[in-house]
Regions:
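Single conserved hydrophobic/aromatic residue that forms the stacking wall/gate
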Residues: 1-9, 14, 398-408
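Cytosolic, long alpha-helical scaffolding segments
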Residues: 199-200, 206, 213, 269-285, ...
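Extended, charged coiled-coil "arm/hinge" scaffolds of SMC/Rad50-like chromosome-maintenance ATPases
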Residues: 208, 291, 295-329
């Protein structure tokens, strides 16, 4: 127990994780972390917290009941269409879709928490215009949970960072729109959303808008972000111009009218002077090769240009990769903020989705009690109603209580 407790404690505070009262839970968490260490061979920075599961919070549904109720897939075809999830899922993000599925598979049984969710959905239906604006801002958001996992495992490519930037650029307007709501759950979501404007600015300043997938091909870093990148990039694209300017300058300076800058793979770049102009060659020209009718020279300035031009591409690719990794690492350092925000966005997406479904289908808000009575008047099966055409669905009347058990 102490060994596993030490392992969990090294990753996250046991007290903060809620495991301080769960000896068996600490052992299980420690065993899982050890397994991940041994199999992933990598940092577990994406695991920022452990949340204990309480059987008193959620309804326990066995696998047979889950299948027969067709909560997330149909019994025969094993497809989403025709299931309860199919009716309820109007989410805009992958995170929201996963969270809604978890809601359906693990229904709450705590009356207070159920009513908090009802309050959030009710508020969203009372502010239809704001709700639709929220949907528009949710739609472009990529899967932040998966993106930050790739970032922390150092497998994210430049396009992942652009997707991350485009996603978090939606956060400020979403956070602002949530000012219109007063309910506890929506306020908690607003507080948990971190706009992360400095990370958005970092990626916007550094990474090309349409970068390659590979991090080893160059073309990753924007102009103006790093002076050396700009210098190497200019050397790569403007090398011929620089050489032509140097050639013209040396002709004028020396008076050698037929002086030319040439290149071969053996000697690199050189200044070629015919024998008829040998007497005009200045002292700072260093002889590199002698031919039958000409001499080849190098100057410090030409050597500097040669090093810059020939090494520019390799240096550029290497430097861009290093800068990209630096940006990626800065994002990875904010994993806790990003995960908290991703969870908040996922929950918001779910509540907006449920509000849309309730509005479109004219669902009413049930009154929750602890009396043990289920009393439904004008009940409609959400799935059957959708599958039957021409308004043929017949409303149901159901009363279930302890003495009578069931009456329809």
């Amino acid at each position: 127990y102490e060994m596993q407790r030490s392992l969990v404690g090294s990753e996250m505070c046991i007290r903060d994780s809620g495991l301080s009262d769960y000896a068996c839970g600490t052992i299980a968490a420690g065993a899982l972390l050890r397994y991940l260490y041994e199999t992933q061979k990598n940092d577990l920075g994406n695991l920022s917290a452990i949340h204990p599961y309480s059987t008193g919070k959620y309804m326990i549904i066995d696998s047979s009941t889950r299948r027969n109720l067709e909560l997330v897939e149909t019994l025969r075809e094993k497809q989403k269409r025709g299931s309860l999830l199919w009716v309820l899922d109007k989410t805009k993000t992958a995170m929201g879709a996963r969270t809604l599925r978890a809601y359906v598979e693990q229904p709450l049984i705590d009356k207070t928490e159920i009513e908090l969710r009802q309050e959030a959905i009710g508020e969203l239906n009372d502010h239809v215009i704001t709700r639709e604006e929220l949907r528009e801002y949710l739609n472009p958001i990529y899967d932040l949970e998966r993106l930050i996992t790739r970032v922390t495992y150092r497998t994210a490519n430049p396009r992942d960072l652009i997707a991350f930037k485009n996603s978090i650029s939606m956060l400020p307007p979403i956070k602002s729109l949530l000012d219109e709501f007063d309910g506890a759950l929506l306020k908690n979501i607003q507080n948990d959303i971190d706009a992360m404007e400095e990370l958005c600015s970092l990626v916007d300043r550094s990474i090309m808008e349409e970068p390659p997938i590979s991090v080893r091909e160059g073309g990753l870093i924007k102009e103006g972000y790093n002076e050396d990148v700009d210098k190497y990039r200019n050397a790569k694209t403007e090398g011929k111009t620089w050489l032509a300017e140097l050639e013209a300058k040396e002709r004028e300076k020396t008076g050698i009218k037929n002086l030319k800058i040439k290149y071969n793979k053996v000697f690199g770049y050189y200044l070629e002077v015919t024998n008829s102009y040998k007497d005009l060659v200045p002292d700072y020209f260093t002889r590199k090769q002698t031919l039958a009718n000409a001499e080849r020279y190098i100057t410090p300035e030409l050597k500097e240009l040669e090093d810059m031009i020939l090494g520019a591409e390799d240096k550029l690719v290497s430097l861009e990769y290093d800068l990209f990794c630096e940006v990626r690492n800065k994002i990875a350092e904010e994993v806790v903020r990003i995960q908290r925000t991703a969870k908040a966005i996922a929950n918001l997406d779910v509540f907006v989705s449920l509000a849309v479904v309730a509005d479109q289908n004219n669902y009413c808000r049930p009154k929750m009690t602890n009396s043990g009575v289920i009393d439904i008047k004008g009940g409609r099966h959400p799935v059957v109603e959708k599958m039957i055409t021409n308004d043929m669905f017949i409303l149901s009347l159901i009363h279930i209580s302890e003495p009578t058990r069931l009456r329809c």
